[in-house]
């Protein structure tokens, strides 16, 4: 599950909290950014900060980290029995240590703070990759990738009346096996089941490198900070435009474009945004508390339990 907790940029408004996205994958909780009121947003979705194992911060600006002091304080006051690891760009360690010291937070659980650059971190069934953006302070974009799986083609096996056999495990290792006098070639009797990939890009100027970084994403979460008519302001403040987002999505062969970090300046003129988006396909302007289910290879984007978008990345 992917929970879009906060979708605003710069400051909270009566419509949007600032950015945070929580992912619950195979029992691991991953929080991307911790905008103001992240805890409250989690509780509105019946989630708890105690479910967090990893926090990935894009950068140290307040609208992306002001929820962090409260999270650390809550974990210190609750029965949190996990190890928390916080990742972020250079400078994040000093900031977090000052937060802990300034708020006199008694950290009574294992806490690791890791400053990273462009890297790929393996978490077993998935990995998270990072790449630098261009902003007033060091900023990272992130990509979550569920590892592809080698699956046995049961339909083809059924044609040879082969249903189950311990030797079939060898096929997944790329080895030929002989069953009932029939030699099975792994190239013919196995296939790759694609893993989920999503990419988060926010608070950065456009970079050509983002296209390869986001390659074949099922979802791209991208900031909606400036329209094209305000491109000069976007460059001045080190942000991307709405056209930059579509360029990354289209040229990277990615699917669903979800806009987050929506600027308060456009809240009263959403009609202008929708005019631009009228002839575009596969996009959603996220709202707080939207969530994405991932079941049997199908992505289901929901708002208030209503399905807005459904897309199968593989079929069983």
Curated annotation (Swiss-Prot):
Taxonomic path: Archaea, Nanobdellota, Candidatus Nanoarchaeia, Nanoarchaeales, Nanoarchaeaceae
InterPro entries per UniProt: Metallo-B-lactamas (IPR001279), RibonucZ/Hydroxyglut_hydro (IPR036866), RNase_Z/BN (IPR013471)
Keyword tRNA processing: yes
Gene responsible for this protein: rnz
Pfam families with a match to the protein in the record: Lactamase_B
Catalysed reactions listed for this entry: Endonucleolytic cleavage of RNA, removing extra 3' nucleotides from tRNA precursor, generating 3' termini of tRNAs. A 3'-hydroxy group is left at the tRNA terminus and a 5'-phosphoryl group is left at the trailer molecule
Keyword line: Endonuclease, Hydrolase, Metal-binding, Nuclease, tRNA processing, Zinc
Residues that, per the record, bind Zn(2+) 1: 59, 61, 135, 203
Active-site residues from the entry: 63 (proton acceptor)
CDD domains in UniProt: RNaseZ_ZiPD-like_MBL-fold
Gene Ontology molecular function: 3'-tRNA processing endoribonuclease activity; zinc ion binding
Organism in which the protein naturally occurs: Nanoarchaeum equitans (strain Kin4-M)
Binding-site residues for Zn(2+) 2, renumbered to this chain: 63-64, 203, 261
The protein's name: Ribonuclease Z
């Amino acid at each position: 599950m992917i929970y879009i907790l906060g979708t605003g940029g710069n400051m909270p408004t009566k419509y949007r909290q600032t950015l945070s996205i929580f992912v619950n994958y195979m029992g691991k909780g991953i929080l991307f950014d911790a905008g103001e009121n992240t805890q409250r947003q989690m509780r509105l979705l019946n989630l708890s900060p105690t479910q967090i194992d990893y926090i990935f911060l894009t950068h140290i600006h307040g609208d992306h980290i002001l929820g962090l002091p409260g999270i650390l304080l809550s974990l210190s006051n609750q029965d949190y029995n996990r190890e928390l690891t916080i990742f972020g760009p250079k400078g994040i360690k000093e900031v977090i240590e000052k937060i802990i010291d300034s708020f006199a937070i008694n950290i009574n659980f294992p806490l690791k703070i890791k400053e990273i650059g462009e890297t790929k971190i393996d978490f077993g069934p998935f990995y998270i990759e990072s790449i630098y953006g261009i902003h007033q302070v060091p900023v990272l974009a992130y990509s979550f990738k569920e590892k592809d799986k080698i699956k046995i083609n049961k339909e083809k096996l059924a044609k040879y009346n082969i249903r189950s056999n311990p030797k079939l495990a060898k096929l997944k290792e790329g080895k030929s096996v002989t069953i009932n006098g029939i030699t099975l070639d792994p190239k013919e009797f196995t296939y790759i089941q694609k893993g989920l990939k999503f990419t988060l890009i926010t608070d950065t100027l456009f970079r050509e490198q983002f296209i390869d970084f986001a390659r074949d994403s099922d979802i791209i979460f991208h900031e909606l900070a400036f329209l094209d008519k305000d491109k000069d302001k976007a460059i001045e403040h080190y942000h991307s435009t709405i056209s930059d987002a579509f360029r990354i999505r289209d040229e990277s062969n990615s699917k669903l474009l979800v806009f987050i970090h929506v600027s308060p300046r456009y809240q009263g003129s959403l009609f202008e945004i929708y005019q631009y988006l009228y002839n575009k396909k596969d996009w959603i302007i996220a709202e707080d508390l939207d969530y994405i289910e991932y079941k049997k290879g199908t992505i289901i984007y929901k708002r208030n339990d209503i399905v807005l978008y459904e897309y199968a990345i593989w079929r069983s």
